[in-house]
């Protein structure tokens, strides 16, 4: 089983071993992966990097950046990276928390067409995939909308999903002066996105870690934060709920679930207040929900038909690896509640089937 697992890890690395690669020690890397050792990568320009086996995804991110960059050089004990020779970013060889997130952000973003600007680059030429990176004592990033985040308080994948891949864009939405309930608000990326479109957002986050980072990021966006009500609570069940939180070193998005534990030895059990959608609507005296967004690792299967009466639209990231929960059951509930639905992949690079993971956009038929 371990051998097969290592083969899968190796398959993630092979695309960067093709002709034209600047990696000197390909066979040594293959051997280290197969035997479960730390990865030492040596580039032809003299840069050497040692990355622990526990940080395999970061290792792949490093290879991605080297492949797509036009500048990848060692400068003052830091790696200088540029994709366009104009905008330059610096990664410490020590890989602290900011560096890890920057590494992942650059890797995920460049694959999806992100345009990265550094702090020195002020341009009026801008598109909706621009992310400006301001490196300093506590680095920040800024989206094309002007929304800011602390670099050490982001989930790189969710930032790319929301502000590069734009998975929440929907031309039929008019969020101005509307109510959004966001279950799985993470570090504040989606609440700030919805608020920038004019919505009032009730932002529910299960984990204390993500919740605290959301509060940090809201402080950077004082105007938009007035439209956001952050709540440290799980959505789906009332009362105190026990959940499983992923505490692996590569879990930048703070993944957690009260429905299933798929994190194994990398998980820890914690407790938090839980609220059903019905309780949320009653507690906050919400009469009309324009959009219910669910990205909560299984809580979508706890929706009840009677909770959907005053909800006009849903945006659900669903998971079907859960025992006793099927995508077909969720689809049936929505259709019986008079919703028109569309199912799609939110990540075109995801090799899995739609039956396992995807997005549902639902709109009530009038």
Label every model-predicted segment.
Residues 1-366:
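Phosphate/nucleotide-binding beta-alpha loop and adjacent structural elements of enzyme active sites
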């Amino acid at each position: 089983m371990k051998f097969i697992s290592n083969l899968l890890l190796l398959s993630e690395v092979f695309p960067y071993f093709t002709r034209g690669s600047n990696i000197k020690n390909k066979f040594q890397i293959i051997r280290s992966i197969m035997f479960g050792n730390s990865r030492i990568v040596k580039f032809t320009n003299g840069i050497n990097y040692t990355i622990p086996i526990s940080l395999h995804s970061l290792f792949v991110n490093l290879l991605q950046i080297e492949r797509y960059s036009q500048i990848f050089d060692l400068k003052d004990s830091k790696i200088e990276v540029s994709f366009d020779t104009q905008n330059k970013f610096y990664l410490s060889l020590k890989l602290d928390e900011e560096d890890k997130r920057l590494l992942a952000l650059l890797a995920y973003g460049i694959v999806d067409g992100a345009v990265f600007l550094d702090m020195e680059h002020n341009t009026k030429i801008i598109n909706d995939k621009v992310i400006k990176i301001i490196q300093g004592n506590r680095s920040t990033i800024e989206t094309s909308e002007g929304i800011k985040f602390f670099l050490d308080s982001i989930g790189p994948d969710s930032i790319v999903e929301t502000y590069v891949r734009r998975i929440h864009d929907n031309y039929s939405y008019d969020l101005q002066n509307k109510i959004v309930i966001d279950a799985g608000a993470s570090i504040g990326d989606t609440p700030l996105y919805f608020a920038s479109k004019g919505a009032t957002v009730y932002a529910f986050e299960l984990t204390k870690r993500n919740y605290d980072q959301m509060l940090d990021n809201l402080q950077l966006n004082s105007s938009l934060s007035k439209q956001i009500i952050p709540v440290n609570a799980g959505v789906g069940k009332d009362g105190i709920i026990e959940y499983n939180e992923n505490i692996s070193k590569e879990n930048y998005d703070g993944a957690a679930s009260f429905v299933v534990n798929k994190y194994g030895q990398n998980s820890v059990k914690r407790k938090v207040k839980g609220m059903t959608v019905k309780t949320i609507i009653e507690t906050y005296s919400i009469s009309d929900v324009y959009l219910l967004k669910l990205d909560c690792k299984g809580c979508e299967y706890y929706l009840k038909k009677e909770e959907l009466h005053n909800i006009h639209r849903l945006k659900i990231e669903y998971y079907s690896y859960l025992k006793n929960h099927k995508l077909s059951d969720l689809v049936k509930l929505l259709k019986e509640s008079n919703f028109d639905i569309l199912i799609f992949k939110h990540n075109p690079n995801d090799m899995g089937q739609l039956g396992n993971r995807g997005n549902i956009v639902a709109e009530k038929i009038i």
